[in-house]
């Protein structure tokens, strides 16, 4: 698949095939990709925790807030939950990471996972103190993102919209997840 196809296929995934496992090495390989990416002032202030243990996965799962636009849904059911997690932290000993670094790292993990047939959900809304307790993380590390990873179970489609249209993603009656995306022409400030 070429790069454009990779990017277009890299959709947020919230339901995973629970029969397929994610290994510690799978997660380590994704974090390894991040170390090659740019970092503002070359601070490299991001740190990562990788979790592929079912018991710890279950604890992490309970700290996450899934799909804010989908009402009455608390996240994937048993058998559709992620097989692993990458947790992203800022190390305060190195100063705050540039916000761009966080986005670059998350997108690199997402694209790396997608290139291997996996999918992720980049989550910023979670119980950060509970994550630190579960993982036994020190005071110098502040949680920034939780990235569940697994093999996708859901179908996600992109719906073209224009500026001003409703941007809320939704699931239709067939459980197909629709993600509205503004058309390229409307993104341009000077045409």
Q: Where do the language-model regions lie?
A:
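Acidic, surface-exposed loops and disordered segments
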Residues: 1-191
